[in-house]
Every structure is written in C-alpha cells, then in structure tokens.
Regions:
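A general lysine-centric signal
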Residues: 2-3, 176
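Generic cytosolic/nucleocytoplasmic N-terminal low-complexity/intrinsically disordered segments
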Residues: 1-2, 319
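Ser/Thr/Gly-rich flexible loops in soluble cytosolic domains mediating phosphotransfer, phosphorylation
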Residues: 127-128
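Sec-dependent N-terminal signal peptides of Gram-positive bacterial secreted proteins and lipoproteins
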Residues: 3-21
C-alpha cells in the first residue's frame, strides 16, 4: 500500500510539472540585465511550501533564460519565520514564504484567518484563501508593511499525535502536549481541555520519547516526515487550525523590477500555487493509511464533538475579532457564513 501511495503522489507531481511546462509563455528579455534574488525560507526541505518554492524558482530561472537566479536557503538557516518576514519588510531579503500567523504583530487582523476551527474543510480553505478574506488581509499587509503578497500555499490541517488513545473531547482533559508559544494555539488546545506547554520543535521528539510530554500537534505530513509514529501511536484528527504560508516580496524591490520580470515571477507562481494546493490536499488525504502501516491508530471527533466545538468557539471568534482592529468583526461574520 505504501508503495502505491508513493507512486500516486509521484505521478501527481509529474502530471503537474508536465501541465506547467505545457503552459510556458515567451517573454521579451532583450533589454533585461541579470538579477539575483535573495530568498531564504524558514521551513525544511520536505515542507510543502519549500518543495513548491523550489519548483517556482526553477521555473522563473528557465523562463528568464537564466537571467533571474536566486541566493536561496531553507530550514531557517538565516533566521526564524518572524525574523525572515521582518527582513523582507526591511529590505534585507527580497522574498520569502512565511506562515500567516507571523504577521499579527504588524497587522492584528491577520488572526481572523488563524482562529481555531474558522476553516471547515479544504473547499472552505480554498474559498477563503483564494477569495475576499485573504485579499482583504493581504491588502492590509501591503498598507502597513513594505511587503506585497504574491499568493498563498495551503499546508493542511493540524492534528494531535499522542502516546495514549484520545477519541473524544473528554479524553483531552488535562492531557499534556507541546504547542507553539502563541496565544491562539494555547487558547485553542486549552479550550479543548489539553494542558499545553511550549518547547522548541527540535526537542519535542525526545520529550515525548522520555515521557516529559504526552504528545504534540502539527500537520500530518510533518508528523510523518519526522518519524513521530515511532514514539506515539495515536492520532486524533482535531483539525483545529489550517496552516498556510504567504509568498511575500519586498514592495520597494518589486516595484523597481522590469515589468517583464514581474510578469515572469507572478505568472509562474500563479501556476505553482494551484499545483501546490492540489498536492497538499492529496498528501494530507494519503497520510492516514501511511500512519496505519506504521502501527498508528487514527481517530476522528464524533458529530456530537463537532457540535460542542462550534459551541465552544463561536463566541470566542467574535470576542477575539472585536480586539483585532477595524474590519475584523465584519470579516468574522463573513467567515462564519462561508462555513455554511
């Protein structure tokens, strides 16, 4: 089964690459000079946003006949996601790909898209991030920072892996897991009953193995790629957050580029964006059987639990939105309506 799933995913990526190649355009580069773009990434080499950013860079270099190249790094070699975002804002770096939640210190309204359970499913995620809500947020980012958002890469829903079976909300009470040191995460998991502690991602595996904590939460592909199935044998698909990354460029740098370069970069990403979303969804859907092959039991919340979750968070959404700044209270009503 594992080999079949791998072959399916490889075939999907090959089909996507073929489709992208067929759609190539020609550009007038006769008056253009060579350009090197600095593009550091915070995530590791297996992360979906890293994989597709690398494909995007290759496409840009090819379409520019080698005139556009990249000074590229990943795995937070040049700093954390927040540091890289601030570096793009200050003009220290030209581009990056950053989780949306990192922007809230500069644009508090971004948290309206990062609220727990505000994204219902993949169809809803596409409607939100390809539609009015994300357009509003990216407009605010451009107004308040020297940053232009070129697009979004969906990363998937976050779930909890644990050493003990968790099958319902009641099982989560006082269960100790690692969460990022962010208020929204602590609020979300705490509201489900979890006891939350923060530590670096690099320490989490050994902490679970040693029994210091009982589990952690992130996307399924990250859990699998880092081998958490060896130290924790249960997953509860809580789907408490939908993770996404914004593809950003320093606005001053962007506006000084030749129009043909902007077209190459933007056109290429438009094609990569669609492929990345399809791959992220397909990958997430393939994860459950892969975990089961590793001896992991996967649970889902019941319909009754989902009703309780909506009761827990519907008031929370509105209370939080009021504190996020102008327009957030109206946007939360739009997001709630889009879940219907």
């Amino acid at each position: 089964m594992k080999k079949v799933l791998v072959l399916i995913l490889v075939a999907l990526m090959c089909m996507q690459c073929a489709a992208l190649a067929e759609s190539e355009q020609t550009y007038d580069l006769s008056s253009c000079e060579p350009l090197k773009i600095t593009l550091p990434l915070p995530n590791g080499i297996t992360a979906i946003d890293t994989v597709y950013t690398e494909q995007w860079m290759e496409m840009i270099t090819e379409r520019s006949n080698g005139l556009i190249t990249f000074d590229y790094s990943n795995s937070a070699a040049l700093g954390s996601a927040l540091e890289l975002m601030e570096g793009v804002d200050m003009g220290d770096y030209d581009m990056s790909v950053i989780d949306l939640a990192n922007f809230d210190a500069y644009v508090p309204q971004v948290d309206v898209l990062c609220l727990p359970y505000i994204i219902k499913d993949w169809d809803n995620a596409r409607a939100v991030y390809m539609g009015e809500p994300n357009a509003w947020i990216t407009g605010l980012i451009s107004e308040n920072m020297d940053i232009t958002v070129l697009g979004t890469i969906g990363m998937g829903f976050r779930s909890v892996i644990s050493k003990d079976p968790l099958t319902c909300i009641a099982d989560c009470k006082n269960y100790l897991i690692r969460t990022p040191d962010l208020e929204l995460y602590i609020d979300a998991l705490g509201s489900l009953g979890f006891s939350c502690t923060s530590m670096s991602f690099s320490e989490t595996y050994s902490a679970i193995e040693a029994g210091v904590i009982n589990g952690m939460e992130t996307t399924l592909n990250v859990l699998y790629d880092n081998g958490y199935y060896d130290v924790a044998k249960y997953i509860l698909q809580t789907r408490h957050f939908f993770a996404c990354s914004e593809v950003i460029v320093n606005t001053s740098f962007w506006e000084e580029l030749p129009e043909v370069y902007r077209s190459i970069i933007a056109d290429s990403f438009k094609e990569i964006e669609a492929a990345a979303w399809d791959y992220a969804q397909t990958t997430e859907e393939s994860m459950v059987p892969k975990f089961e092959e590793k001896g992991v039991t996967v649970y889902e919340f019941s319909d009754e639990d989902h009703v309780e979750i909506l009761n827990i968070f519907s008031d929370y959404w509105r209370e939080k939105a009021v504190k996020m700044g102008e327009g957030a209270d109206e946007m939360i009503e739009t997001l709630i309506a889009m879940q219907q």
